[in-house]
């Protein structure tokens, strides 16, 4: 997990564009293939993704195998490329009405074009800030934000 806290990566960029914060160098194949989260025999790995700039709404997914650093970054990347769950629009844009209107206007009212990434405002590019485990929810939380 120390490696994850040393990764600089913008979640809207391909995973292989990540670099080490400490050196500015690309991750090696060995680092990308290292295990980020090891699966317990008896239960799946739960990863929760932030889908709101105000830290109010998360989506949780379960995985049933070990997750390498590269796979984790790919999971995150593709999650934010997915179409937004339109039934959760009010939850996703909670306390962000102006941003919701801007995004909807940008896509000319075509809600089907919205992706999970659109939940974040354009004031800064969201970057990966690590992964935090919460015992209470038994879930790993993808930390997103400007550092």
Regions found by a protein language model. Give the residues of each.
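Mature soluble extracellular domains of secreted precursor proteins
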Residues: 46-48, 64
């Amino acid at each position: 997990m120390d490696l994850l806290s040393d990764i600089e990566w913008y979640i809207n960029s391909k995973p292989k564009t990540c670099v080490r914060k400490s050196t500015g160098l690309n991750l090696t194949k060995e680092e990308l293939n290292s295990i980020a989260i090891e699966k317990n025999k008896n239960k799946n790995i739960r990863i929760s993704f932030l889908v709101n700039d105000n830290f109010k709404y998360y989506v949780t997914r379960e995985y049933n195998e070990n997750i390498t650093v590269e796979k984790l970054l790919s999971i995150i990347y593709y999650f934010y490329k997915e179409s937004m769950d339109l039934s959760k629009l009010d939850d996703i844009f909670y306390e962000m009405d102006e941003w919701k209107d801007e995004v909807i206007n940008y896509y000319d009212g075509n809600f089907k074009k919205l992706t999970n990434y659109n939940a974040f405002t354009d004031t800064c590019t969201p970057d990966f800030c690590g992964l935090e485990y919460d015992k209470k929810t038994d879930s790993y939380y993808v930390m997103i934000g400007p550092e």
